[in-house]
């Protein structure tokens, strides 16, 4: 119900069709999105079954958050048809999607994938090389790992860490990202000055880097207890409703300023109507 508040123009509503088999679902489809559980053997079986029934021209994309396309393509009859298109939840409000082809995927297929994604209101970011966990989840993993250490070492609570993000740098990141935030911090001299001034800090032992805390029962219990207290009795559905309302408000504000995700959404009124050409 939030989507109409974000997009100016939407195509006419379609119909959700439930199928009894993968073959029925993919026959004649132009785009097929695989979203099975994050286990390589399950995905490979599903992808093989998809390719048995889909047309050769179809794009078969995986939502995998961790596997590289070359891993998914192992044993595939048509590996050049498979790529990764990794979105972020809630998919209906966050426009970004990581497109990850392997070396065997033709450039024409990549360009067609980018075009189709743009036509449905997504912002495709095509990575220059495949890597486990792509880009977004690697950044999130680094922050998550450090947060677990801060809780394990008794430095901060889950609520304090979330407050630091929601009341601080998270607000900057939502509109400027990481590098442009630091470029601004460098003053009129820009990024070069920032790197010269703060670059040496990278040598300081501030973080745990790649060390992973042991998620033993004690740490799990501590996180769960603090998170439950932070939720204050609100259900997951209530938290999701609050999240979506906040995202819509933020996207509207970014649209008004014509920046970041808002600038992208401002250009989407016309492209979204292009869905009709894919439904002919």
For the regions a protein language model found, what residue spans apply to each?
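Rossmann-fold dinucleotide-binding core
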Residues: 59-129, 133-137
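Rossmann-like NAD(P)-binding element
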Residues: 2-59, 67
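C-terminal regulatory/interaction module of P-loop NTP-utilizing enzymes
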Residues: 118, 144, 148-157
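Short acidic alpha-helix initiation/capping motifs at coil-to-helix transition points
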Residues: 138-143
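NAD(P)-dependent Rossmann-like dehydrogenase/reductase catalytic/cofactor-binding core
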Residues: 122, 126, 153-280
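A general structural motif at alpha-helix termini
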Residues: 11, 76, 165-168
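Short, flexible helix-loop junctions that flank or precede catalytic/ligand sites
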Residues: 50, 130, 149, 163, ...
């Amino acid at each position: 119900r939030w989507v109409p508040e974000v997009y100016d123009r939407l195509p006419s509503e379609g119909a959700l069709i439930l199928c009894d088999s993968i073959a029925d679902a993919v026959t004649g489809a132009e785009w097929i999105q695989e979203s099975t559980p994050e286990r390589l053997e399950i995905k490979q079986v599903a992808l093989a079954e998809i390719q048995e029934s889909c047309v050769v021209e179809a794009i078969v994309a995986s939502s995998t958050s961790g596997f590289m396309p070359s891993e998914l393509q192992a044993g595939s009859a048509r590996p050049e048809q498979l790529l990764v298109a990794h979105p972020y939840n809630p998919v209906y409000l966050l426009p970004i999607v990581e497109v990850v082809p392997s070396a065997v995927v033709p450039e024409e297929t990549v360009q067609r994938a980018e075009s189709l994604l743009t036509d449905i209101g997504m912002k495709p970011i095509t990575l220059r090389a495949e890597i486990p966990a792509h880009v977004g989840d690697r950044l999130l993993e680094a922050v998550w790992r450090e947060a677990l250490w801060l809780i394990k070492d008794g430095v901060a609570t889950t609520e304090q860490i979330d407050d630091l993000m929601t009341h601080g740098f998270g607000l900057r990141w939502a509109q400027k990202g990481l590098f442009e935030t630091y470029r601004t911090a460098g003053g009129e001299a820009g990024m070069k000055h920032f790197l010269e001034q703060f670059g040496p800090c990278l040598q300081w032992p501030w973080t745990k880097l790649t060390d992973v805390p042991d998620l033993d029962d004690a740490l799990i219990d501590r996180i769960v207890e603090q998170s439950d207290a932070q939720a204050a009795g609100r259900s997951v559905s209530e938290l999701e409703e609050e999240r979506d309302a906040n995202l819509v408000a933020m996207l509207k504000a970014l649209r008004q300023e014509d920046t970041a995700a808002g600038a992208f959404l401002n250009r989407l009124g016309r492209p979204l109507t292009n869905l009709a050409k894919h439904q002919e």
